[in-house]
Amino acid sequence: MADVSERTLQVSVLVAFASGVVLGWQANRLRRRYLDWRKRRLQDKLATTQKKLDLA
């Protein structure tokens, strides 16, 4: 194995950790946005269906 200095190891671990945090944060934001969109869409569908039933 190549001789890796302690500093390089610390920096690489820090970079890996930071990228994992950022990636997880972005993925969670995306998931939240998707769930909010789905909820809104289903509520709109429900409202239109209820309107149709009321008119029938």
From Swiss-Prot:
Q: Which domain of life is it from?
A: Eukaryota
How this chain sits in the membrane, per its record, is: Single-pass membrane protein
Localization annotation = Mitochondrion inner membrane
Please list the residue ranges that the record places on the Mitochondrial matrix side of the membrane: 2-9
Q: What is the tissue localization of expression for this protein?
A: Enriched in heart and skeletal muscle (at protein level). Also enriched in adipose tissue with lower levels detected in liver, pancreas and brain (at protein level). Higher levels in differentiated myotubes than in satellite cells.
Q: How does it assemble?
A: Interacts with mitochondrial trifunctional enzyme, a heterotetrameric complex composed of 2 HADHA subunits and 2 HADHB subunits. Interacts with cytochrome b5 reductase CYB5R3; the interaction is required to maintain cellular lipid composition and leads to stimulation of mitochondrial respiratory complex I activity. Interacts with ATP synthase subunit ATP5F1B/ATP5B.
Q: What does this protein do?
A: Positively regulates mitochondrial complex assembly and/or stability. Increases mitochondrial membrane potential while decreasing mitochondrial reactive oxygen species. Increases mitochondrial respiration rate. Increased mitochondrial respiratory activity promotes myogenic differentiation which facilitates muscle growth and regeneration. Increases mitochondrial calcium retention capacity. Plays a role in maintenance of cellular lipid composition through its interaction with cytochrome b5 reductase CYB5R3 which is required for mitochondrial respiratory complex I activity.
Family of this protein: Belongs to the mitoregulin family.
Q: Which PANTHER family match?
A: MITOREGULIN
Name-wise, this protein is Mitoregulin
Q: Which organism is it from?
A: Mus musculus
